Amino acid sequence: MSSLDILASRLPAGTISTDPQTLHHHAIDSWSLALLRRVRGDDLPGPAAVISPASTGEVATVLAWASQTGTAVIPRGAGSGVCGGAQADPQAVVLDLSRMDRIGEVDAISRTVEVQSGVRGDRLEKELAKLGLTTGHYPQSVAISTVGGWIAASSAGQASTGFGAIEDVLLGLTAVLPDGEILRLRPVPRSAAGPDLRRLLVGSEGTMAVVTEATLACRARPKAWDWLAFGFADFAVLADTLRTVQRAETGAAVLRGYDETDAQLGFGALNHTTGCVALAGFPDGPPGLDARKQAATAILRATGTELGARYGEHWWQHRNDAVRTYAQIMGPERAFGPGVIVDTMEVAGLWSNVPRLYDSIRTALAAHAQAVACHLSHLYPSGSSLYFTFLITGTDDQDAEARYRQAWHTAASSCAEAGGTITHHHGVGRLKAPFLETELGETGAHVLTRIRKALDPGGIMNPGVQRPRIKQ
C-alpha cells in the first residue's frame, strides 16, 4: 500500500483525486508568467494528488501524514493569487480548501461572522447583506478569492482606507500546524498576551500553517455611496492633495488617485482623455456626511477641477472588470495575441517617498514595457500604496518572458532604493522571493527563516514560497 493509499484510508471517500484533469487544473495559480507558459504549451507538471478536505480535522490528518512521510504540501484557496504562491510540484500534494465553504454563526451583538477558509468573498457578502451587514473587505478578486486566501496573502480591500485591511477584520482563527496540531486563537478585538499569533499567520502564504477557520468583524452595510471626483494636471499634486484629504478624517472609505495613463484606461468610457483623476467615496450611515463631504470637496477643489459623481459611480460599477480583462489577455483567448504579458506591481511607502517611488518604478518598468499605469488606492496617514499595471510585448513568448524578468528585477531594485516595500497586498509567492532579503535585511531574513524552520522543521509547507536567498 502506497503512502497516498494509507492517507486515503484515513479520509472520507473522494477526498483525494489523481484525475489528470484535476491535477492539470491545480498545477498553477493566476501568476501571469505561469499563465503565459501554459498557453504557449509548456509542460507544467501537476501535483501527485489533489486533496480536498471538508473540516479542520481532515486538514490535521493530511498534515500529520505529510509530516510523517516528508511530503510537500501546497495549500490552495481559489487559485486567484498572482505571485506564484500555489505552483504545483510532481512530488507534492495540493491541499484544495474550496470544499471548506461553510458560513457559520453570525453574532449580531458583536457583529462577527464565523467562516471556513474556503468561503468565497462574493458569497460571504451576499449572505451578510441579508442581515444588513458587510465585512467591508472588497478585494478586486472578491468573486474568485477566499477568506483563507485573503489571510494568506495579507489582502487589502478596495475600501481599506476607511474599513481597514484583512488584519483589521480578522478577530480569531483556527489553523493546523505542519505536524497536524491544531492552533485555536479565540476571537477578541485586541490582545496583549504576547506577540500576536494571528498576525504572524497573516501574509504567511501557507508556509507556517494552514488557516481553516476565521472569525471576521462585520459592520453595517452601506445602502448607498456618495462620490467626489476631481481632475489634476500633475500626479504629484494629486498625491499631495489626497494625503491632505486622508488626514482630514473626512470619512472617505475609498480614496483613489490615477495617473494620466490609468485614468484613460479606467475612465475612457466617460470620454476622459487627459489629466489625472482623484476619487473619494463616502458610505452612507455615519452622521455628518454632508459636512464631511464638504470638507473633502474644499480640499480637492483647491488644487483640482471637479469632474462629477459619475466618475465614482462608473468606477464602483466596473471596479472588478480588470479580473475578466486579465483572463482574456493571459488565458487561452490571448486577446492581445502571443508575446504579450500583463502584470501588476503593488508597492507602498511613506508619503515623503511616494513621488520618488512613482518616478523611479515607472521609469524602471517603462524600460521594458510598452505601457505603464499607476494609481494610489490604499491610503494611510503615513503613506500610500502605489499600484502599477504594465504591459509587455515581445517578439514572441520567450522574448516577452525575458523582458518580464528584467522588468521585475529593475523595478524591485528601484522600489528598494526609493524606500518602499515590494508588496502591499498581493503577497510574495515565488515571484518576489528573490527580493525578500533586500526587503527584510539579512537579519530579518534569518528571523523569518528561523521562525519557519521552528514551525516546519521538515520543510514541507509550500516549498519555494517566501524563501529568502540568504547564506545559511
What are these regions (language model features)?
Residues 181, 432-472:
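Activity-critical C-terminal alpha-helical subdomain
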Residues 1-64, 81-111, 260-269, 314-342, ...:
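N-terminal flexible segment immediately upstream of the FAD-binding catalytic core
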Residues 12-13, 416-428, 452-453, 457-461:
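Alpha-helix capping/hinge segments and adjacent helical runs
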